[in-house]
Regions:
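Extended acidic/polar, glycine-enriched regions
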Residues: 1-53
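Solvent-exposed loop and edge beta-strand segments that line ligand/cofactor-binding
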Residues: 3, 69-82, 123-135
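Low-complexity, Ser/Thr/Pro/Gly-enriched N-terminal "stalk/linker" regions
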Residues: 8, 39-76, 80, 100-108
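Structural helix-adjacent loops and short alpha-helical linkers that scaffold large soluble proteins
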Residues: 18-28, 51, 93-106, 113
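Active-site-adjacent bridging/hinge elements
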Residues: 28-34, 57-67, 108-119, 138
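Extended ligand-binding clefts on enzyme/binding-domain cores
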Residues: 76-96
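Helix-terminus loop motifs that line ligand-binding clefts
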Residues: 97-143
Length: 143
């Protein structure tokens, strides 16, 4: 069994196996779904089925982009960018009422402040990056 230390995100899986002419039987394949355990407490109703599908995709995305922190995407960087985090925090609060990740994000970003008050654009991260307007998003989150 292969189980990575950190989760891997995928939609499709291609397995290339060379058997050198020997028969191959895959007895079992499984994967585990991982997402932050936000509960959907808000209700979205519409007589347009397409809008309900958009709601479902958006809510699934919100859950997939949250784990120990909020992050920009579950596939690539997995970094908590302030610009994305503010939107994700509002979605979490409005739909679930769960404020744990919101409070965590506010504290994380507070810890990222430089001496002049600007926050890093993404935190926690080993590589400091500053996008000045993102500091204002953090101020808006605290307000």
């Amino acid at each position: 069994m292969f189980r990575p230390v950190w989760f891997r995100t995928w939609r499709y899986l291609q397995i290339d196996i060379e058997t050198n002419g020997e028969p191959l039987q895959i007895n079992r394949f499984s994967s585990e779904f991982t997402a932050y355990p936000l509960k959907e407490n808000a209700i979205f109703e519409s007589d347009q089925s397409g809008l309900k599908k958009i709601w479902n995709v958006g809510w699934r995305t919100a859950r997939l982009c949250a784990n120990e922190t909020y992050f920009d995407c579950p596939y690539y960087e997995q970094l908590q960018y302030v610009g994305d985090t503010r939107i994700q925090a509002l979605v979490s609060l409005y739909v679930s009422g769960d404020d744990r990740l919101v409070r965590n994000a506010i504290m994380n970003l507070s810890e990222s402040q430089f001496y002049e008050g600007l926050t890093r654009s993404r935190y926690p991260s080993a590589n400091p990056q500053i996008i000045p307007p993102f500091s204002l998003y953090w101020v808006d989150m605290v307000n």
